[in-house]
Amino acid sequence: MKPQCILISLLVNLAYAEEYLVRFKNPTAFQQFTSNSNRSWRQFIDNKIEKKFSIGSFRGVTMNLSKNLVNKLKKSPLVADIVPNFRFEAFEGDSVNSAESSYTFNATAKYSYEDVEEEQNITYQPDAPRHLARISRHYQLPFDVGDKDRYKSWFNYYYEHDYQGQDVNAYIMDTGIFADHPEFEDRVIQGIDLTKEGFGDQNGHGTHVAGLVGSKTYGAAKRVNLVEVKVLGKDGSGEASNVLSGLEFIVEHCTKVSRPQGKKCVANLSLGSFRSPIINMAVEGAIEEGIVFVAAAGNFNLDAYWASPASAENVITVGAFDDHIDTIAKFSNWGPCVNIFAPGVEIESLSHLNYNDTLILSGTSMSTPIVTGVAAILLSKGIEPEMIAQEIEYLSTRNVFHRRTLFFKPSTPNQILYNGVDKLDDPYDDETFPRLNIEAIAKELEEYNATLQTPMSENLQSGSKLWGWNNDVTLPLGEIRLKRRDFMKNL
C-alpha cells in the first residue's frame, strides 16, 4: 500500500487511537518505514511514533494507532507484528503460608558470618541458606516434615574463592533494588528507572531477586555488581514498552560502559507475559550482542513455550524445584524450553522494607536469579557468553526427579543446578528425609491449576486472536484456569 493511502487512513482514525507495539521484519524495513521520501508521510510518522527501539537486529516502535489503521499496517511488507502495549508482570508463585499473601517475613535475619577457607581455592559459607547449600552438592538435603527448622543451621555453601562474579555486571530487570541494604556492600549501580517512581524498590520482588543473585548471605555470586533496571512499578507490573526500553538500555550500557571497564554482562528476567513474538525477538536481539540472559519459566504449570521471554531462542530458561523433596514445584512451567531447574520453594532473601527482616517467596522468579548468580561465576572463570547455557547444563546434577513425576511434562529436562565446585558432598549424621508418595505427587503435578491473566485481556474481546501471533491458538481471554492438557490438544 502506498504511504499516501495509509496517511489518509491515519487522519480519518486519529480520534480512536491507542498505543501499539510495532515490530519490523529487519533493520532495512524499519529504515524504509521511517525515512520514506514522501514529506507528509515522514511528518505524520514522526508525530505518531512515541519511542523507537534498536536492540541488535530487532527494530520496533510504539505508535498511537486506531484499530482500522492496525488492519491497514499489518498488510505492509515491512511490518512483522503489531500488538497493543500490554502489561508485563513480575512472576510470583504460591505464597508460603496462604493464598492471599505473597510474602512471609522472617525477623531473625543475621548478616554476619566468616567464610572458611578450604583446600584448592574452595571456600564455604557456614550456616548457609538451604538454596545455596543445595546447588553446591549433588544429593538431596535432609528435611524433617515435622520440624522444619531441625536442619536450618547445618548447611554449608561451597564455592571457589577467586570466582565470585567480581568482574561481572548483573542487570536486574525488575521492580527496583533497595540499594542501601548492607548485604549489597555498595555493589548496586543505578541504571535506569522506566516507571517514573524513582530508583529503589516499593514492591519487594526486585530486592529479593537481587539478593539471590549477589547479596553477601543469600547470593550465589558474592561479589557481582548489580545494575538496577527498573521496568516494573510498585504493583509488580509494567508496560511491554518498558521492557523493550530496559533491554535497549542493557545492550547500550553493557557495550558502552561495562565492557570498556573490563566487565562481562548477564541479565536476570524474573518477569514475563503470555507468549509474545515481539518480546522474544527483542531478547534474541540483545543476546546477539554477547549478553547472557536468564529468564523465569513461569508459574502456571504449563509448557514454557507459552511464556515470554522464557520461550525466546538462546535465553537460559529456569524452572523451579522443591529442594525439600527434590521434585519439580507444582506451579513451575516445564517443557523443552527449560534449560535447568533451581530451588524455587520457600526461598529466603532480602526485604525491601528494612535491614533486619528477610522475605520468603516461592516461584520461578526465585529460581532464576540463583542461576544468574552461577552464570556470573562462570563468566568470571572465563567461559564465553555463548557457552554459558551449555556449561550450566554440563555441570548440572541429572536424573534427580522421579520419572513418574515427569510423565505429564513431555520433553522436560531432568537436571538441576550445580555450581561446579569440585568436592564431595557433606555427610550428615541422623539424616531424615521425607517419605514420598510418588503416585500422589504425580497426580498433584498433573492436576494443579494456576490462574493465568493473559496480557491482552484488556485489549481484546473474548476468544479473539491478535494478528502476528502465528503460532498461538485461540483461547478465551481474561482470567482463566488452564490445565496442561488444554494446551496439548492444540500442539
Swiss-Prot record:
The active site is at D174 (charge relay system), H205 (charge relay system), S365 (charge relay system). Keywords: Glycoprotein, Hydrolase, Protease, Serine protease, Signal, Sporulation. Gene3D superfamilies: Peptidase S8/S53 domain. Glycans are attached at N38, N64, N106, N121, N268, N356, N449. One of its GO terms (biological process) is ascospore wall assembly. It is found in: Spore wall. GO terms for cellular component: ascospore wall; extracellular space; nuclear envelope. GO terms for molecular function: serine-type endopeptidase activity. InterPro entries: PCSK9_ProteinaseK-like, Peptidase_S8/S53_dom, Peptidase_S8/S53_dom_sf, Peptidase_S8_Asp-AS, Peptidase_S8_His-AS, Peptidase_S8_Ser-AS, Peptidase_S8_subtilisin-like, Peptidase_S8_subtilisin-rel. Changing S365A: Abolishes protease activity. Its EC number is 3.4.21.-. Residues 142-442 form the Peptidase S8 domain. Residues 1-17 form the signal peptide. N-glycosylated. Its main location: other. The keyword Transmembrane does not apply. It is an enzyme of class 3 (hydrolase). Belongs to the peptidase S8 family. Subtilisin-related protease involved in the formation of a protective dityrosine layer required for spore wall assembly. Identified in a screen for mutants with increased levels of rDNA transcription. This is Subtilase-type proteinase RRT12. It comes from Saccharomyces cerevisiae (strain ATCC 204508 / S288c). The gene is RRT12.
